[in-house]
Regions:
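ATP-binding N-terminal substructure of ATP-dependent carboxylate-amine bond-forming enzymes
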Residues: 1-125, 138-146
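ATP-dependent carboxylate activation and anion-phosphoryl transfer catalytic cores
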Residues: 2-24, 34, 48, 71-73, ...
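Conserved beta3 strand of the protein kinase N-lobe
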Residues: 133-134
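N-terminal non-cleavable signal-anchor helices
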Residues: 139-142, 152, 462
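Acidic/histidine-enriched active-site and ligand-binding environments that engage anionic O-linkages
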Residues: 147-156
Length: 463
């Protein structure tokens, strides 16, 4: 087992990793920027070292600083969390070169999965369904036009190195392509340092279904069921649940088998997620991408399987074989997660970080809260606007929905706006209750959801 781990991240995921390490008897070293000097993960870690100014490029993305701290503090492992360097193949390689265990897949696997266009080719060869699209990258508007003509409109232009909804543009007709191509390439270059693009057919009104996978170095690969992440805004997930209500047992088995194939195709090791689009007929699904890290929403899978995914990451990275077999995985009950973001939905989801004047999280049976906030702390403007994840678990989906409603009624944060009220309204929407939400749900219903919230606020009625 690893003896001391550097947690190369911040916020709630740093806390999540820290807690798992403690329970396994692994010592922890936290890193922090000057803006995070009072952060909770800094206070709870065995050691904490400042690695630079607030700007992420000078701190949490500073590979040399992270590796220097890891070696100086006697660490033998590095956990990247999610975001920042978690899917950076060069960082994984640099850790290995420095004699440190990167708690994630190899740099080679990250590269294979990280290039979206190359990953599509790999999946196609492995027998995993992919959406119709270009054969590899499109280097010019002319190539994009030819590919779009072949598969038919509407189409998506997507960054090969993309993620987080960035570097994506929808085109409904040929006249849209030229401007969209330039915009997407520029955004991809700015966000990822790579402007390579590919094109794929847009699946209208799909569901976003993803499968959690675990793989060890001995060739054992399993999936731990599915998550429905269809409630999104700007390609960013807002509410996630497990298992997906829309899947039949037969379809779940087919998609799970495809997820395992996908992991094997890239030579995967550790925890990862294979994302699919499920079309409206609920018969055809298509590989979208593979996330080579722990996911923000991993908690809903933990609740319905009883498997501690971060603990599994640490065990696998320590060279231990998976003890869990596919037949051991049972999905029991239902879990829902609401991401609480410091943003104002009325103002176009404008980030609104600031000081937490007062904070109260919900509790009770079947409730879990993952957050780094406390009353009096500052939510920094330099990083992601997520303030907390609230999870509710119950024997049935409807009970889980009711429990989450109660959680959001209890949740109180004074100091800045959040999207909690919007999530609360979604939980009452008929489409959500019936499990019929597609990725278009929020675009189609946002105005009515916000209007209902406004009327309740003006009337003084507590929803």
């Amino acid at each position: 087992m690893l003896s001391r781990v550097l947690i190369a991240n911040r916020g709630e995921i740093a806390l999540r990793v820290l807690r798992a390490c403690r329970e396994l008897g692994i010592e922890t070293v936290a890193v922090y920027s000057q803006a995070d000097a009072d952060a909770l993960h800094v206070q709870l870690a065995g050691q904490a070292v400042c690695i630079g100014p607030a700007r992420a490029a000078d701190s949490y993305l500073n590979q040399d600083a992270l590796l220097t701290v890891a070696k100086a503090t006697g660490c033998d492992g590095v956990h990247p969390g999610y975001g920042f360097l978690s899917e950076n193949a060069d960082f994984a390689d640099a850790c290995a070169a420095a004699g440190l265990t990167f708690i994630g897949p190899s740099g080679d696997a990250i590269r294979k999965a990280g290039s979206k266009s190359a990953a599509r080719d790999l999946m196609r060869a492995a027998g995993v369904p992919v959406t119709p699209g270009s054969d590899g990258p499109v280097a010019s508007v002319e190539e994009a036009l030819a590919a779009a003509e072949s598969v038919g409109y509407p189409v998506l232009l997507k960054a090969s190195a993309g993620g987080g909804g960035r570097g994506i543009r929808r085109c409904d007709k040929p006249e849209d392509l030229s401007a969209a191509f330039a915009e997407a390439k520029a955004e991809a270059q700015a966000c990822f340092g790579n402007d390579e693009m590919y094109l794929e057919k847009l699946v209208l009104r799909p569901r976003h279904i993803e499968f959690q996978v675990l793989a060890d170095r001995y060739g054992n690969v399993i999936h731990l069921g599915d998550r429905d992440c269809s409630v999104q805004r700007r390609n960013q997930k807002l509410i996630e649940e497990a298992p997906a209500r829309c899947l039949t047992p037969e379809l779940r088995e087919r998609m799970g088998a495809a997820a395992v194939k996908a992991a094997k195709a890239v030579g995967y090791e550790n925890a990862g997620t294979v994302e699919f689009l499920l079309d409206p007929d609920r018969e055809h699904f298509y590989f979208m991408e593979m996330n080579t890290r722990i996911q923000v929403e991993h908690g809903v899978t933990e609740l319905v399987t009883g498997v501690d995914l971060v603990r599994q990451q640490l065990r696998i990275a320590s060279g231990l074989a998976l003890r869990i077999r596919q037949e051991d995985v049972k999905l029991q009950g239902h879990a829902i997660e609401c991401r609480i973001n410091a943003e104002d939905p009325v103002q176009g989801f404008r980030p609104c970080p600031g000081r937490v004047d007062f904070l109260h999280f919900p509790g009770g049976p079947g409730v879990r809260v993952d957050s780094c906030l406390y009353s009096g702390c500052e939510l920094s403007p330099y990083y992601d606007s997520m303030a907390a994840k609230i999870l509710a678990y119950a024997p049935t989906r409807m009970e889980s929905i009711r429990r989450m409603r109660r959680c959001l009624e209890e949740f109180t944060l004074e100091g800045f706006p959040t999207n909690a009220e919007l999530s609360y309204q979604i939980l009452y929407h008929p489409e959500f209750i019936l499990g019929e939400c597609t990725t278009a749900f929020l675009d189609e219903h946002l105005s009515e959801l916000l209007e209902f919230s406004r009327k309740l606020s003006e009337s003084g009625v507590d929803a």
